[in-house]
Amino acid sequence: SISSIFYVLSFSPFDYKILIFFSLILLLHSLENLSIKDKIKAVFYFTLLCHLLGTSWINNSLINYGSLGHLLSIIITFLFALIISLPYLLIGLYKSVSSNNYFYLSYVASLFVLAEYLKSILYGGFPWLLIGHSQNGTIFDSIYPTMGSFAVSYFVIFTSLFFYKAFTCLLYTSDAADERNS
């Protein structure tokens, strides 16, 4: 999906840092009216594609430096991306961003950060493709030394959630006003 591509493009070597916000907003929009079961599936596909795109270089390394054949290196890279995508299933557990209050955004952002934390701890501190790592060299640089990458992840996710919620509220208010005027 385009949101997965935007996600990966926000990291080095591309460094289109603003795209992480668009990626998350598009993801939230695509999840908005899904059942929890479908939301978990969609989040899994999103994160699997993010990890496949973001760690595709591992395939080349396994071929060139691990002396593996193409098929085996593709299988190993796919399994790796599959495994590191599993903690993100937690993200599908929220109900709806647009139909809840702004305090609920903190809960949803916390689910994202918990998934990132679990990925980092369960898989030996694997830091690649953590949202906070996409924002070095930005306004968030003052947060890294005191609160760390997970705090940056939280602020980026919360900001994306806030803008998504504000935009959907604005659309619903505009649609309701149009219906009353008709």
Q: What does each of the following model-derived ranges do?
A:
Residues 172-182:
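Single conserved hydrophobic/aromatic residue that forms the stacking wall/gate
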Residues 1-174:
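Membrane-embedded alpha-helical bundles of multi-pass enzymes
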